[in-house]
């Protein structure tokens, strides 16, 4: 197999996006468009990848890191000019080079591999990736002769009525013999209405030189979808979302309503997990086997182990261990770690805290900056008072402790194992094992006093 190179065109600003964010950095299912392209090229085992940057160069480079080399296009003078900027990095290389836009996030590694194979088998100088468009309006058309050989690419504005009826379109992806690509680039001019150097002119030059120019027709038109505005971005998200959901269902995940299930590209989900409608799973979340994710849940960058049940709750950078459950309407914030077989009920919030195996936190509770041991009962309305107005402080609760309803644990404080906090207490001092802490005023009943009250 010959050496394979790739060029990603990512220098455009994308004014039609109407955004301060550079076009290729807009996200599709939780990953920037240009990163989608790069990931698929990596999967296709490309030897050498160069990304052409322009507007927002530093931001793009920060996003992609060392996964690719970079070439800078300081002036936006067309796609041909962009590829010329890779001359120092690529012109002397042997092999084949694929060129793809950074705003086409739906292409797959399989398509890139098939394009390379088709190109190499025919010993072509250039191969155009084409597709059949249901509505080809706006696309360049592929004009073939009577025996199916590619004659030229004609743009919409230049096409005759007969040519406009052609449904085979140019997807904007090309595979070139690398040496012949750069030889032809040296011959293109900017003698056109836009004053730009067009990559498509390379095709014409190669045809004039009687080089072999072919076209590989891919099956899935959706892959070729480019994103130039927010409408197209929404469409791309929908296509990618369907692809992601279909993948996980085929891997053994049940989705009650895939149309309303939103899963990012880097999420991982185990078998026999059930996901209800209206669920959003983002970032690098990992979900184990046999989990149940209830309607309306939102999970971001969290790790969910096997057999976990989440009902209408929000998790951010949290972890839930085997057999634990939460919800409805509770919130795990960053650095919350829930141990095995822990129950977190409704309207609870946990932040920067560890809750040990078998502990139960039923309802209406805030736990922040705390470590809780095993088999603790936390009653309704308990507040871990962690903030003194300046600093956050830590609370420790030992194994088998009992925290009565409507109690406040004022940090820093240590509730020893096997100790008991009476309901309604405000605890400011630590306890010893087997202590029962009561911190509330003694009740006084004043006879007949209610008769004096105005109500």
From Swiss-Prot:
A Gene Ontology biological process noted in the UniProt record is: UDP-N-acetylglucosamine biosynthetic process
Superkingdom in the source lineage: Bacteria
According to its UniProt record, which residues of this chain constitute the active site? 363
Q: Which residues bind acetyl-CoA?
A: 386-387, 405, 423, 440
UniProt KW keywords: Acyltransferase, Cell shape, Cell wall biogenesis/degradation, Cytoplasm, Magnesium, Metal-binding, Multifunctional enzyme, Nucleotidyltransferase, Peptidoglycan synthesis, Repeat, Transferase
Query: What are the boundaries of the region Pyrophosphorylase?
Result: 1-230
Q: Name one Pfam family in it.
A: Hexapep
Q: Does the keyword Amino-acid biosynthesis apply?
A: no
Q: Tell me which InterPro entries the record gives.
A: Bifunctional_GlmU, GlmU-like, GlmU_C_LbH, Hexapep, NTP_transferase_dom, Nucleotide-diphossugar_trans, Trimer_LpxA-like_sf
CDD domains cross-referenced by the UniProt entry: GT2_GlmU_N_bac, LbH_GlmU_C
- UniProt cross-references to NCBIfam families, sorted A to Z: glmU (TIGR01173), PRK14354.1 (NF010934)
* Family of the protein in this entry: In the N-terminal section; belongs to the N-acetylglucosamine-1-phosphate uridyltransferase family.
Function, as annotated, reads: Catalyzes the last two sequential reactions in the de novo biosynthetic pathway for UDP-N-acetylglucosamine (UDP-GlcNAc). The C-terminal domain catalyzes the transfer of acetyl group from acetyl coenzyme A to glucosamine-1-phosphate (GlcN-1-P) to produce N-acetylglucosamine-1-phosphate (GlcNAc-1-P), which is converted into UDP-GlcNAc by the transfer of uridine 5-monophosphate (from uridine 5-triphosphate), a reaction catalyzed by the N-terminal domain.
Q: What is this protein called?
A: Bifunctional protein GlmU
Q: Which organism is it from?
A: Limosilactobacillus reuteri (strain DSM 20016)
Q: What is the lineage of its organism?
A: Bacteria, Bacillati, Bacillota, Bacilli, Lactobacillales
């Amino acid at each position: 197999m010959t050496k394979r190179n790739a060029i990603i065109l990512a220098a455009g600003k994308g004014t039609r996006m109407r955004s301060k964010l550079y076009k290729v950095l807009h996200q599709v299912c939780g990953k920037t468009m240009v990163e989608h392209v790069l990931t698929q090229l990596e999967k296709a085992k490309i030897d050498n990848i160069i990304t052409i940057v322009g507007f927002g160069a530093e931001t793009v480079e920060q996003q992609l890191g060392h996964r690719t080399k970079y070439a800078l296009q300081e002036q936006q003078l067309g796609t041909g000019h962009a590829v010329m900027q890779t001359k120092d990095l690529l012109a002397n290389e042997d092999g084949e080079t694929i060129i793809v836009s950074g705003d086409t996030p739906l292409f797959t590694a399989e398509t890139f591999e098939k394009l390379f194979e088709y190109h190499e088998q025919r010993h072509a100088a250039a191969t155009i990736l084409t597709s059949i468009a249901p509505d080809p309006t706006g696309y360049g058309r592929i004009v073939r002769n009577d025996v199916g050989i590619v004659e030229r690419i004609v743009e919409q504005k230049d096409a005759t009525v007969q040519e406009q009826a052609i449904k085979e379109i140019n997807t904007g992806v090309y595979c070139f013999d690398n040496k012949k690509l750069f030889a032809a680039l040296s011959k293109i001019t900017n003698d056109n209405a836009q004053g730009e150097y067009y990559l498509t002119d390379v095709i014409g030059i190669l045809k004039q030189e009687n080089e072999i120019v072919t076209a590989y027709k891919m099956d899935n038109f959706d892959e070729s979808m480019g994103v130039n505005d927010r409408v197209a971005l929404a469409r791309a998200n929908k296509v990618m979302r369907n692809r992601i959901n279909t993948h996980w269902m085929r891997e053994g995940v049940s989705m009650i309503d895939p149309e309303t299930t939103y899963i990012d590209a880097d999420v991982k989900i185990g078998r026999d997990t059930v996901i209800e409608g209206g669920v959003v799973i983002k970032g690098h979340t990992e979900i184990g086997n046999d989990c149940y994710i209830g309607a309306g849940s939102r999970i971001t960058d969290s790790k969910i182990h096997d057999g976990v049940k989440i009902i209408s709750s929000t998790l951010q950078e949290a972890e839930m261990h085997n057999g634990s459950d939460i919800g409805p309407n509770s919130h795990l914030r960053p650095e919350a770690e829930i141990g095995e077989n822990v129950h977190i009920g409704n309207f609870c919030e946990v932040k920067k805290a560890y809750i040990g195996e078998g502990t139960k936190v039923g309802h209406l509770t805030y736990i922040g900056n705390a470590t809780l041991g095993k088999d603790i009962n936390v009653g309704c309305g308990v507040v871990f008072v962690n903030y003194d107005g300046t600093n956050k402080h830590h609370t420790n609760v030992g194994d088998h402790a009992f925290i009565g309803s409507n109690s406040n644990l004022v940090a820093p404080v240590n509730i020893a194992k096997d100790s008991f906090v009476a309901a309604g207490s405000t605890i400011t001092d630590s306890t010893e094992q087997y202590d029962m802490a009561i911190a509330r005023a003694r009740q006084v009943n004043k006879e007949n006093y209610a008769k004096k009250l105005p109500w």
